[in-house]
């Protein structure tokens, strides 16, 4: 990689760190190409990205970003997983690491918060933003449905009473 390419890569990675909702750093030593391709495709399907970068370049790219506190994690063979949704990258990395012992979560960052490996794992257990929206919408709709049922119930009961009186009068 030439000097100009390195500068361009650092600039691109710096923008990624600034725009990402969360960044996860993990070791991938011993992972096969097929495993890495599978990991990348799962991350891409979830809306995230996985990059392998030189540690020195990643540390330079971290300067001036909110995630600057994770620069000490870049030792050995590291990969960077990131996404705009704060939950996506940790969730995919932790799920993939469960089935593959070659991927070891080191830590990460969410905004200005630096996370250790346990922090990333606990973040991965949270529901995604879309799941939270769906739950909130369900909570909002439930009372309205119940109110509509309560309001409609007396009217239907009155209709049944009038119907019973009408049938009684017809029979008499």
Swiss-Prot record:
Function: Forms part of the ribosomal stalk, playing a central role in the interaction of the ribosome with GTP-bound translation factors.
InterPro entries hit by this protein: Ribosomal_uL10, Ribosomal_uL10-like_sf, Ribosomal_uL10_bac, Ribosomal_uL10_bac_type
Subunit structure: Part of the ribosomal stalk of the 50S ribosomal subunit. The N-terminus interacts with L11 and the large rRNA to form the base of the stalk. The C-terminus forms an elongated spine to which L12 dimers bind in a sequential fashion forming a multimeric L10(L12)X complex.
Cellular component terms (Gene Ontology): ribonucleoprotein complex; ribosome
Organism: Rhizobium rhizogenes (strain K84 / ATCC BAA-868)
Similarity remark: Belongs to the universal ribosomal protein uL10 family.
Domain of life: Bacteria
GO biological process, one term: translation
Listed GO MF terms: large ribosomal subunit rRNA binding
Pfam family for this entry, one: Ribosomal_L10
Keyword Nucleotide-binding: no
Protein name per Swiss-Prot or TrEMBL: Large ribosomal subunit protein uL10
TM regions (residue ranges): none
Keyword field contains RNA-binding: yes
The entry's keywords: Ribonucleoprotein, Ribosomal protein, RNA-binding, rRNA-binding
């Amino acid at each position: 990689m030439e000097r100009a390419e390195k500068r361009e890569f650092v600039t691109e990675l710096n923008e990624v760190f600034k725009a990402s909702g969360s960044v996860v750093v993990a070791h991938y030593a011993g992972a096969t190409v097929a495993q890495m391709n599978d990991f990348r495709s799962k991350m891409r399907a979830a809306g995230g990205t996985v990059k392998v970068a030189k540690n020195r370049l990643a540390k330079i790219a971290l300067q001036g970003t909110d995630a600057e506190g994770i620069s000490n994690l870049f030792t050995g063979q590291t990969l960077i997983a990131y996404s705009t949704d704060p939950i996506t990258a940790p969730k995919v990395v932790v799920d993939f690491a469960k089935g593959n012992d070659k991927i070891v979560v080191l830590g990460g960052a969410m905004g200005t918060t630096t996370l250790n490996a346990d922090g990333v794992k606990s973040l991965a257990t949270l529901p995604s933003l879309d799941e939270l929206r769906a739950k909130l919408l369900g909570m909002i709709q439930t009372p309205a449905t119940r109110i509509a049922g309560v309001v409609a119930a007396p009217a239907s009961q009155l209709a049944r009473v009038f119907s019973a009186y009408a049938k009684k009068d017809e029979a008499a």
